[in-house]
């Protein structure tokens, strides 16, 4: 079998994605990979194939009286329910309140900060290490002073290896490669140490990893 390179259009921009289609040399059949479907597929086929998985983002900041959330992103028919759309929408919501200090590199303004990068790492790791074959929820909760990321499945590496970094054993390597192609999760095995380092630099409470 061969994985083909696919060009995906997102908001008028072309994004190169690998592992989206597969070609079987023996049968000469071509089709969408399971990872490609989950990442870039249409909402209904994604829900049909992955009826065991839900995606849910809940913002519990700035709550009004008797409100359970101030913002929520879930399956409501207003967006294509694939991982790529979920990732891009959630990362925008998670970081919209973060400060972006004015910084120039040459003549170009740099809006990214270590905190933005750490939050992207957390979301990326939640997705690539999720067990998409069991019943569960890819869930992110935003509170006034914390973020909570949860996914189905158990850790594939010992806790000590994750804390130390340098090793990666993604449960979804094809999805990991797709995210890396669009600029997320570049450094193998560095995600959690990056988060710890950033939170420590901010003198914030140490993040907790629970299996």
Where are the regions that the model predicts?
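Short beta-strand
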Residues: 139-140, 188, 208-211
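Active-site helix-to-loop segments that bind/position phosphate- or nucleotide-bearing substrates
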Residues: 1-134, 142, 153-170, 191, ...
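Conserved DxG motif in ATP/Mg2+-binding regions
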Residues: 147-152
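Glycine-rich phosphate-binding loop
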Residues: 168-203
């Amino acid at each position: 079998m061969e994985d083909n390179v696919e060009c995906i259009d997102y908001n008028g921009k072309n994004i190169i994605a690998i592992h989206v289609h597969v070609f079987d040399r023996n049968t000469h059949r071509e089709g969408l990979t399971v990872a490609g479907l989950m990442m870039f597929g249409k909402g209904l086929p994604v829900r049909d194939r992955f009826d065991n998985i839900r995606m849910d983002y809940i913002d519990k900041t700035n709550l009004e009286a008797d409100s359970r959330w101030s913002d929520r992103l879930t399956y409501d028919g207003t967006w294509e329910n694939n991982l790529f759309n979920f990732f891009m929408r959630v990362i925008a919501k998670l970081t919209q309140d973060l400060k972006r200090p004015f910084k120039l590199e040459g003549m170009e303004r740099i809006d990214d900060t270590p905190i933005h990068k750490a939050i992207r790492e957390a979301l990326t790791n939640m997705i690539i290490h999720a067990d998409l074959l069991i019943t569960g929820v890819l869930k992110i909760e935003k509170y006034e002073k914390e973020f909570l990321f949860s996914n189905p499945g158990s850790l594939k590496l010992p806790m000590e290896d994750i804390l130390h970094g340098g090793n990666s054993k993604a449960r979804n390597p094809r999805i990991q490669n797709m995210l890396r192609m669009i600029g997320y999760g570049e450094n193998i095995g560095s995600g959690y140490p990056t988060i710890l380092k950033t939170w420590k630099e901010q003198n914030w409470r140490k993040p907790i990893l629970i299996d």
